[in-house]
Amino acid sequence: MITKADKNATRKKRHARVRAKLTGTAERPRLNVFRSNQHIYAQVIDDVNGVTLVSASTLDKDLALNGTSNTEAATKVGESVAKRAVEKGVKEVVFDRGGYLYHGRVKALAEAAREAGLQF
C-alpha cells in the first residue's frame, strides 16, 4: 500500500529531477506551484538572483474564496498571480509544476494564468 509519505517522497524526487533542468531568469522567471491538502500556492521566482517576484495563494485575503481546496480556488490563484506578474512587467515564465501531475488544481491554475496574460 502506498502511503501519503511515499507519495510525497516520490513527488519530491520528481521535482528535484525537473528542477535540475529548469531555471528561472530575470527575463523569464519560474512559475512554481505548491499544492497542499487545504491550499494552493503560486510564486514567480527569479532563480539567478534568488528573489520571489510575486506570489499568490488561497490564503490571500483579497481573494474572496468559498473553498480553498478546489479547482475554482486554483483558477482564482492563477489569475491573481498572472495579474501581479504582468503588473511587475513579467510576460513570459517557465512553468514548474512542482512534481505534481498536470491535472486538476495544477492544470486549472496554469490555464488561468495563461488566460490572464502569462506565456509559457
Swiss-Prot record:
GO terms for cellular component: cytosolic large ribosomal subunit. Gene3D superfamilies: 3.30.420.100. Pfam families: Ribosomal_L18p. It comes from the Bacteria. One of its GO terms (biological process) is translation. One of its GO terms (molecular function) is structural constituent of ribosome. The keyword Ribosomal protein applies. The keyword rRNA-binding applies. Keywords: Ribonucleoprotein, Ribosomal protein, RNA-binding, rRNA-binding. CDD domains: Ribosomal_L18_L5e. InterPro entries: Ribosomal_uL18_bac-type, Ribosomal_uL18_bac/euk. HAMAP family: Ribosomal_uL18_B. Belongs to the universal ribosomal protein uL18 family. Part of the 50S ribosomal subunit; part of the 5S rRNA/L5/L18/L25 subcomplex. Contacts the 5S and 23S rRNAs. This is one of the proteins that bind and probably mediate the attachment of the 5S RNA into the large ribosomal subunit, where it forms part of the central protuberance. This is Large ribosomal subunit protein uL18.
